[in-house]
Amino acid sequence: MTMPLQIYNTTRRELAESVLTEVVTTVLQEEGFLIESLVAVYCGNKMIHRINREFLGHDYPTDTITFSYSKGSEIDGEFYISLDAVEENALRYKVGFDEELMRVTIHSALHLAGYQDGKDEERVQMQEKEALYLKRFVTPST
């Protein structure tokens, strides 16, 4: 039996995979999608840099790369998240690692749901959705 959502962690950092699964599943379900087959890979900058260069022609690491092969309301795809980039983002935005990991995971799920962030108005809509879902999964630090 195959799992519709498979999470792979290629790093030594421990991740709360059950929480990440809940986040991805919730976002996609609430956006009107079912997961047919989804692979989530949490990796380091070296791996995501290689993927970014090979598949997108960008010669630098990034926080997330999403590939969607979906048709209709069934999600078929994969996403890669660099935990190194998540850590850098967390420092830059002065938030905890776990909160930034949730945000980037939500961001990846939203890409799979069809949201884009290439234009300013798309980015604003994406950030609003991220904030909406983030409130549900992250307790704000004081």
UniProtKB/Swiss-Prot annotation:
Cofactor notes: Binds 1 zinc ion.
Entry EC no(s): 3.1.-.-
Gene Ontology terms describing biological process: rRNA processing
Xref: Pfam families: YbeY
Subcellular location: Cytoplasm
GO cellular component: cytoplasm
Protein's job: Single strand-specific metallo-endoribonuclease involved in late-stage 70S ribosome quality control and in maturation of the 3' terminus of the 16S rRNA.
Matching SUPFAM superfamilies: Metalloproteases ('zincins'), catalytic domain (SSF55486)
Protein name: Endoribonuclease YbeY
NCBIfam families named among the record's database cross-references: rRNA maturation RNase YbeY
Main localization category: cytoplasm
Annotated GO MF terms: metalloendopeptidase activity; RNA endonuclease activity; zinc ion binding
Similarity annotation: Belongs to the endoribonuclease YbeY family.
CC cofactor: Zn(2+)
Binding site for Zn(2+): 107, 111, 117
Keywords: Cytoplasm, Endonuclease, Hydrolase, Metal-binding, Nuclease, Ribosome biogenesis, rRNA processing, Zinc
